[in-house]
């Protein structure tokens, strides 16, 4: 690409690179890293005529939620309530959605979007999915702090309703 002074690199990130969630530190921080790396390389590679961008999908019907696992520890059965509540909340959000582009799509929808972004001029960060547009709009209008408060309230009410389990659960995931 440098020799040709032309090329496009598309990194796949996630809407999870825009905000953190409890128990998703490793996943979300890796997505934040992809966003940051892409932004830095955008400036550097533009000197060689190379375009680099991210595509950050939101929720899609991919089976991703089936792979939720917080720890390989033998104590992981203690996290079953968290894992099951989180999976249920995510699945409930997806199952009643209309088809893409008005709701959640599938892997083919993301692949087509990535291809389109690779052959057209587009922004450095590109979001796909209705939830990504809603979250980005919310952050732009109300700021991240209000989003954090809402996430915390939803987390404690839907995912881990018994606050006394919070510290114990955290220690099993991160210690």
What are these regions (language model features)?
Residues 19-25:
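Active-site loop immediately N-terminal to the catalytic Tyr-X3-Lys motif
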Residues 1-5:
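A short helix-coil junction within the Rossmann-fold of NAD(P)-dependent oxidoreductases
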Residues 11:
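Rossmann-fold scaffold of SDR-type NAD(P)-dependent oxidoreductases
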Residues 46-98:
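C-terminal beta-strand-loop-alpha-helix "lid" module of Rossmann-like NAD(P)-dependent dehydrogenases
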Residues 52, 92-141:
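Core catalytic loop region at the nicotinamide-binding pocket of NAD(P)H-dependent oxidoreductases
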Residues 14:
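Residue(s) in the substrate-gating loop at a strand-loop-helix junction
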Residues 19, 40-51:
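Active-site-adjacent segment of SDR/Rossmann-fold oxidoreductases
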Residues 30-33:
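Active-site helix of classical SDR
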